[in-house]
Amino acid sequence: MDEMLILVDADDNAIGSQSKTRVHQQGLLHRAFSIFIFDSQGRLLLQQRAFSKYHSAGLWTNSCCGHPRWGESTLAAAQRRLQEEMGFSAELQQVSSFTYQAAVPGDLIEHEFDHIYVGLFDGKPQGAPEEAHSWSWTDIQQLTDETTRNPEKFTVWFLTIMKDLGANEMERWARLAAS
């Protein structure tokens, strides 16, 4: 069965639900989250999406991302998906939210009200193979350079966050996660 996503208005008020496939085909605004996990050295955990994903397969992105279920808080969903996707838990704190709309491969449209969470973890992730093909701890400045040189290797939402917020904000998030 196709996952149901929460449709929202411009202020993130729930206004209904729709199947994930239809949401991405029609570019409907829906609630989502993006998690940025840092280690004590200030490096960001990136995941390479599984090659079996129906969009953005094999692309590098932030540590974890997903959608809450109806009646589930965004924080609870973020904690659940971090465990399911990457095999660990971390204390998460919300640092921002934003709305974006972008075309993704496969004639699909991402249109998300995206809640951004940060956390600290110093272990080795145990990524679920159906979610994450690989992972890497990456220096923020090197990541900034890589996203500029090779944007085609990254998801549209991750590039949007990197472009809009930049390395200074990422470094601030790393310090916040460590505090």
UniProtKB/Swiss-Prot annotation:
Binding-site positions, Mn(2+): H24, H30, H67, E110, E112
Gene3D superfamilies attached to this UniProt entry: Nucleoside Triphosphate Pyrophosphohydrolase
Domain Nudix hydrolase per the UniProt entry, residue ranges: 28-160
The reaction(s) this protein catalyses: isopentenyl diphosphate = dimethylallyl diphosphate
Pathway in which the depicted protein is active: Isoprenoid biosynthesis; dimethylallyl diphosphate biosynthesis; dimethylallyl diphosphate from isopentenyl diphosphate: step 1/1
Cell compartments where the protein resides: Cytoplasm
CDD domains the record matches: NUDIX_IPP_Isomerase
Top-level class of the enzyme under EC nomenclature: isomerase
Alphabetical UniProt keywords: Cytoplasm, Isomerase, Isoprene biosynthesis, Magnesium, Manganese, Metal-binding
GO MF assignments: isopentenyl-diphosphate delta-isomerase activity; metal ion binding
Listed GO CC annotations: cytoplasm
EC number(s) on file: 5.3.3.2
Record-listed Mg(2+) binding positions: E85
Active-site residues, Swiss-Prot/TrEMBL: C65, E112
Cofactor binding remark: Binds 1 Mg(2+) ion per subunit. The magnesium ion binds only when substrate is bound. Binds 1 Mn(2+) ion per subunit.
BP GO annotations: dimethylallyl diphosphate biosynthetic process; isopentenyl diphosphate biosynthetic process
Cofactor: Mg(2+); Mn(2+)
InterPro entries: Idi_bact, IsopentenylPP_isomerase_typ1, NUDIX_hydrolase-like_dom_sf, NUDIX_hydrolase_dom
Complex and partners: Homodimer.
NCBIfam families hit by this protein: IPP_isom_1, PRK03759.1
Family, per entry: Belongs to the IPP isomerase type 1 family.
Biological role stated in the UniProt entry: Catalyzes the 1,3-allylic rearrangement of the homoallylic substrate isopentenyl (IPP) to its highly electrophilic allylic isomer, dimethylallyl diphosphate (DMAPP).
Official protein name in the record: Isopentenyl-diphosphate Delta-isomerase
Organism encoding this protein: Serratia proteamaculans (strain 568)
